[in-house]
Amino acid sequence: MSYEEIAVQFASESIDEQTVAGWVTDFAYQGFDAKRVIALVKDRGGEDWKQDVKKMIVLSLTRGNKPNKMILKMSDKGKAMVNELVLKYKLKSGNPSRDDLTLSRITAAFAGWTCQAADYVQEYLPVTGRAMDAISSSYPRAMMHPSFAGLIDQELPADVFSEITQAHCLFMIQFSKTINPSLRGLSKDEIVSSFERPMQAAISSTFLTSANRRAMLKTLGIINDNLKPSSSTVSAAKVFRSL
């Protein structure tokens, strides 16, 4: 039997729906899926999910993404709140599967609120607002979290897209060196390569439409109604290029 005949014959093989469905689950993408994160949050959170999400975002912004470690240095009231959230949402600290929730996934799924909240807690972030201002005057606070990448609209004019991305990278370099000291002696390109893949994945995500992203960027003051970047964004991008 020729290979062609084998291929033709194989086309008549039966398709068992239940078996195929099982394979789909087994092979499902294990990375970040914002829709799945939101579905899990709503399912596990009940009526209070919105308030809980705000708590978890502030927690992630100010204390990181590992609940089991952060509670070691926290008030009794804070510990109780964190432990309640961990139990309620089944929060994981590392190596999550598709149906696991982490603080970082929640901040990314709700990036619009995360980036607004960054302004309010700027002095409690790993890299503070004052620290960024020392590098680039009036640095955009909304860019001061990795989740901002999920709001960048790649359908903006090329020069605007580039300015916004480079301005965000300026923060990401400082953030990466702060949370990973081993990067501090590396070149700009080497540090960028450490966060470039997840950043590009967030930018390329189809979760938010171009229109939604632009609306959020306007709300955050990153671009105006004419799609022009703010002066602080342009300045930050210029500093990034000069590194």
From Swiss-Prot:
Encapsidates the genomic RNA, protecting it from nucleases. Displays high affinity for single-stranded nucleic acid. The encapsidated genomic RNA is termed the nucleocapsid (NC) or ribonucleoprotein. The ribonucleoprotein has a non-helical structure. Serves as template for viral transcription and replication. After replication, the nucleocapsid is recruited to the host Golgi apparatus by glycoprotein Gn for packaging into virus particles. This is Nucleoprotein. The record marks 29, 32, 65-66, 98, 105 as: RNA-binding. Belongs to the phlebovirus nucleocapsid protein family. The N-terminus is involved in homooligomerization. RNA binds at residues 29, 32, 66, 104-105, 184, 194, 197, 204. GO terms for molecular function: RNA binding. It comes from Punta toro phlebovirus. Keywords: Capsid protein, Helical capsid protein, Host cytoplasm, Host Golgi apparatus, Host nucleus, Ribonucleoprotein, RNA-binding, Viral nucleoprotein, Virion. It is found in: Virion; Host cytoplasm; Host nucleus; Host endoplasmic reticulum-Golgi intermediate compartment. The keyword RNA-binding applies. Its main location: virion. InterPro entries: Capsid_Phlebovir/Tenuivir, Nucleocapsid_Phlebovirus.
